Amino acid sequence: MAANVSPSAETLSSGAAAHPSNTAEEIANQYNLLPKLIPYLDRHLVFPLLEFSSGQDDEKEIVRAKYELLKHTNMTDYVANLWKEINNSDDIPDEFVKKREEVLAKLQQYEEESAKITQLLQDESVVANLRSDKVANLKFLEEQHGVTVEMVNSLYDYGRFQYSCGSYGNAAELLYQFRVLSTDNDKVASATWGKFASEILTTSWEAAMEEVQKVKDSIETRLFNNPLGQLQNRSWLIHWSLFPFFNHDPARDVLTDLFFSPAYINTIQTNCPWILRYLAAAVITNRNRAHKNSSVYQKQLKDLIRVVRQEGYEYNDPITDFIKALYVDFDFEEAQKKLGEAEEVLRSDFFLVSTTDAFVEAARHLISESYCKIHQRIDIKDLSTRLGLNQDEGEKWIVNLIRDTRVDAKIDYKEGTVIMNHPPQSVYQQVIEKTKGAFFRTQVLSAAVAK
């Protein structure tokens, strides 16, 4: 299934060509990741991204891109309608009529070939006798009900065909049934990718997350002696996982941990550094959930800063530049500028559009916290400007910040300032902090030398 690659990124992303009319649109077009994402997605998974682009780009080009994307699938009626729209015609060529008839005939054939085994798998008395041992299950079905390997394989073929027709719910069920019985490891792996895609396209996020784990396990075991194959498959998994990542809240922690794991952060740095945008957005917005486990969040933030710093020469956008400006360069003016640009990028990104407000809110908190740590007396007007707020909004923001974070500070409304009470750090504590830093740097150098 994963091998069902999309048409070239250039062909499809031509529908997202820049038509700049203002700075916001220029920023969105400059940092459009669609050409980067397409090669790592199945063509059916690309379709929602093109749909999202419909409101942003030349509608005719988007329709043409959809046609190029889907013309080799079995979604015959939809493809025919796209052809009519492109050619401004009410009639369609005979080839579409012929293909539709062929698809219907093939569906009928697959339904008949798989009828016996699908009926058996819907029989509770039969299912009750199935065990975790696939070989034993197949032997039981063969001896008791005359099931053959060919019948099992028909489930796989039928599931793939239903997927190509856009019947993703049916495809998920058929591929699941096939996977329960088949001992063909290659086909089982393909069926797992297919079921993963089907669950994504039916927005069945819990089921999709179950498939994430199954695909991950398959990559580790089936491709154990194939590092290049592992790299490619992990890259696919990372990209496909973006769908549940930002649509299913429980997936956020699981996938953030996965992306930061050594094998996957290495894959991101080696093969697809643009994924840092999504990892950064996840970590920043996780600040709003930091009460769950503050130490985990701080570790994620430190890891993110480290990777952004390392990969700055390879990839950057306003989201990663915001991290760099705030935590590497300590440039608050640049951080404010990049936050404004990041907001435009987020609003134009299919995966991140729903996180925009949460990102901006969390980013403002991070700017405030960093700014307050290094200043004793803070001008409210100045800080408001850095947060992109007017003075009244900034004053309310700072009041809420002091209340929510319980920092030791007071507001002098007459002077328009915030006075921070930074307790002096003991010499003992300073030595501990410096020792920690020296120890960490020693570990990094040792690891580098060991390589």
From Swiss-Prot:
It comes from Aspergillus fumigatus (strain CBS 144.89 / FGSC A1163 / CEA10). Component of the eukaryotic translation initiation factor 3 (eIF-3) complex. Component of the eukaryotic translation initiation factor 3 (eIF-3) complex, which is involved in protein synthesis of a specialized repertoire of mRNAs and, together with other initiation factors, stimulates binding of mRNA and methionyl-tRNAi to the 40S ribosome. The eIF-3 complex specifically targets and initiates translation of a subset of mRNAs involved in cell proliferation. Pfam families: eIF3_N (PF09440), EIF3E_C (PF21357), PCI (PF01399). Residues 256-425 form the PCI domain. Belongs to the eIF-3 subunit E family. This is Eukaryotic translation initiation factor 3 subunit E. PROSITE patterns: PCI.
